[in-house]
């Protein structure tokens, strides 16, 4: 049934729905001011939530945060200071020497792979580029891919594509028989099959060889797991079949792989010691960031005054570690957390609590970006808007100080777009309107909040800001679009059941079921297919010429990865679950025990 569904419907083009004041469903008073407020505005809230016995409001019954501010403040930050810095610098130099000494191309690639999976590659970007340049140029200078070594060929292909080099899928043709199928004897090479499987996820649209490689390797790796053979390799295979490396959150992957590597027969003790100490040092930087944003969140008063909304400061910060973990980007993580927290709160205003009349007023006030216009709002919306207004203006002020560039109009546009698209969904719900899947996705890739996050991301990590990038940013380039679609579809897979129970518009799964008569299981399979198809589009655009920096593009990819991670086992953001709690503990709270010998 699922296969018929996948082939019977055309692939959606995911064009952006136009926002026009002439569109009745998006009709909003268009009065804007690009005024800039450098100092925060204070708001005295008369009551905690404006209520009226005549207004029937929904409730999501969100539970309080399990991570309260006092607990975050009590965290003891270890692994800081001169001793740790001295130790890590010694280990870093030892590993740098390894990178310079290794000359065998396969050993070079394997060392890069280990460094990436241990979360250490960010220390050696120049060395890794030098090695990959050499591997790539030698290959084009007459050196051939080694047809007899599937593992080496696939590893080489994957690392080169990951780092932006152009490599043809045809390198895998030498592993096919005269009928054009992958050779049956390859099934005996499980290490090679796993390498082929991971490489296949870097495919773009139309690359049929890699499609075949994915299907072929998946089938035989699943058979290998069933036979329960060599334990360590089976663990790696199971892990990859759950999610390929290309789709995984890098920091969480590093934490998992450090444990695996510790028990590897070929473990390099220097690499292991470096990985464990570096993880703890980076975690200490994250804990310092977390304390700051927890203090900010408490100071907003949103938890007390908007009691219907999600109180998720740690989960919001967890998102940011998924986007950019390197210790030097602490400012980015702290600002990202504010953006995530504001999106979460405003989403609950539109989805859970606000009446349609109130939401139209709120959208109008955000469009104006004018504190004088907020008198028309109920009290709970006043504090919400003021927190948004002050926080975003402060971010813009930081950029003005740093780069002498006025960015408030770009940030404001991102929030206006978000609220407009929230309002569309609120009207759908109010009118009991059931959109088509196409119509839903055209709205929902904006309402997921990812474009708003990524617009802010550009300014947080870019210096200097360029006109070419800004012109592109205003139209939401494809790299933002594909990341946002994946985030939305992953969210829907994890949250749609709970959201429908509390009262919400149909999500992607229900839209597809309504259109086709498919079962929920069949619809879920189709949404997974759309995620996979969108990754192909993103793979193409990440390697294309772009006005954006590598770090920004990586953040866009990481947002998609983080969404798939957080919604893998249900609503890991709003409702929380055991998996999310365990991941937060391992990534942000509990350091890796070190061998003191």
Swiss-Prot record:
Family listed: Belongs to the terpene synthase family. Tpsb subfamily.
Domain notes per entry: The Asp-Asp-Xaa-Xaa-Asp/Glu (DDXXD/E) motif is important for the catalytic activity, presumably through binding to Mg(2+).
Localization annotation: Plastid, Chloroplast
Catalytic reaction equation(s): (2E)-geranyl diphosphate = beta-myrcene + diphosphate
One Gene Ontology cellular component annotation held by this UniProt entry: chloroplast
Thermal activity characteristics from the UniProt entry: Optimum temperature is 40 degrees Celsius. Active up to 55 degrees Celsius.
Pfam families, A to Z: Terpene_synth, Terpene_synth_C
Disulfide-bond pairs as recorded: none
Binding residues for (2E)-geranyl diphosphate: 310, 347, 351, 488, 491
Cofactor(s) required for function per UniProt: Mg(2+); Mn(2+)
UniProt protein name: Myrcene synthase, chloroplastic
Lineage: Eukaryota, Viridiplantae, Streptophyta, Embryophyta, Tracheophyta
Binding site for Mg(2+) 2: 347, 351
One GO molecular-function entry: myrcene synthase activity
């Amino acid at each position: 049934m699922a296969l018929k569904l996948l082939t019977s419907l055309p692939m959606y083009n995911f064009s952006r729905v136009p926002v026009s004041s002439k569109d009745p469903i998006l009709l909003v008073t268009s009065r804007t001011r690009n005024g800039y407020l450098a100092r925060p505005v204070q708001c005295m809230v008369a009551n905690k939530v404006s209520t009226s016995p005549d207004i029937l409001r929904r409730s999501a019954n969100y539970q309080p945060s399990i991570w309260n501010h006092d607990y975050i403040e009590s965290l003891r930050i270890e692994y800081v200071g001169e001793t740790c810095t001295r130790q890590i610098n010694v280990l870093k130099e030892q590993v740098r020497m390894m990178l310079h000494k290794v000359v065998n191309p396969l050993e070079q690639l394997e060392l890069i792979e280990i460094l990436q999976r241990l979360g250490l590659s960010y220390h050696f970007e120049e060395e890794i580029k030098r090695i990959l340049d050499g591997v790539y140029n030698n290959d084009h200078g007459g050196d051939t891919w080694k047809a007899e070594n599937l593992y080496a060929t696939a590893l080489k292909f994957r690392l080169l594509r990951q780092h932006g080099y152009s490599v043809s899928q045809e390198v895998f043709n030498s592993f096919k028989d005269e009928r054009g199928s992958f050779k049956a004897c390859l099934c005996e090479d499980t290490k090679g099959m796993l390498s082929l499987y991971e490489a296949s996820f870097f495919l773009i649209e139309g690359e049929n060889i890699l499609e075949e490689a994915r299907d072929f390797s998946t089938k035989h790796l699943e058979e290998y797991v069933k036979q329960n053979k060599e334990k360590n390799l089976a663990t790696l295979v199971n892990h990859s079949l759950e999610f390929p490396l290309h789709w995984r959150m890098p920091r969480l992957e590093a934490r998992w792989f450090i444990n695996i590597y510790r028990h590897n027969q070929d473990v390099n003790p220097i690499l292991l010691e470096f990985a464990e100490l570096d993880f703890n040092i980076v975690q200490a930087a994250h804990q310092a960031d977390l304390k700051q944003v927890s203090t900010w969140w408490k100071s907003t008063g949103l938890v007390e005054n908007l009691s219907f909304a999600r109180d998720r400061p740690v989960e919001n910060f967890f998102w940011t570690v998924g986007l950019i973990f390197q210790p030097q980007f602490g400012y980015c993580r702290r600002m990202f957390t504010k953006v995530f927290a504001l999106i979460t709160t405003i989403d609950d205003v539109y989805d859970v609590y606000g009446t349609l009349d109130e939401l139209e007023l709120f959208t109008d006030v955000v469009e104006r970006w004018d504190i004088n216009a907020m008198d028309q709002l109920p009290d709970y919306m006043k504090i919400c808007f003021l927190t948004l207004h002050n926080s975003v203006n402060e971010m813009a002020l930081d950029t003005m100080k740093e780069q002498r560039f006025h960015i408030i109009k770009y940030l404001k546009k991102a929030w206006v777009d978000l609220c407009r698209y929230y309002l569309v969904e609120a009207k759908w719900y109010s009118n009991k309107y059931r959109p088509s899947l196409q119509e839903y996705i055209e709205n929902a890739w904006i309402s997921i909040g990812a474009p708003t996050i990524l617009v802010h991301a550009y300014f947080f990590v870019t210096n200097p800001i360029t006109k070419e990038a800004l012109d592109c940013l205003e139209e939401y380039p494809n790299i933002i679009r594909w990341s946002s679609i994946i985030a939305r579809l992953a969210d829907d897979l994890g949250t749609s059941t709970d959201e429908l129970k509390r009262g919400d518009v149909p999500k992607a799964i229900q839209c597809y079921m309504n259109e086709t008569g498919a079962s929920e299981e069949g619809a879920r399979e189709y949404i997974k297919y759309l995620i996979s198809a969108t990754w192909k589009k993103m793979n193409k655009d990440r390697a294309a010429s772009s006005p954006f920096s590598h770090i920004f593009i990586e953040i866009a990819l990481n947002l998609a990865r983080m969404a798939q991670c957080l919604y893998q086992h249900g609503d890991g953001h709003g409702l929380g679950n055991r998996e999310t709690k365990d991941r937060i503990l391992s990534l942000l709270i509990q350091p890796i025990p070190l061998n003191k010998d």
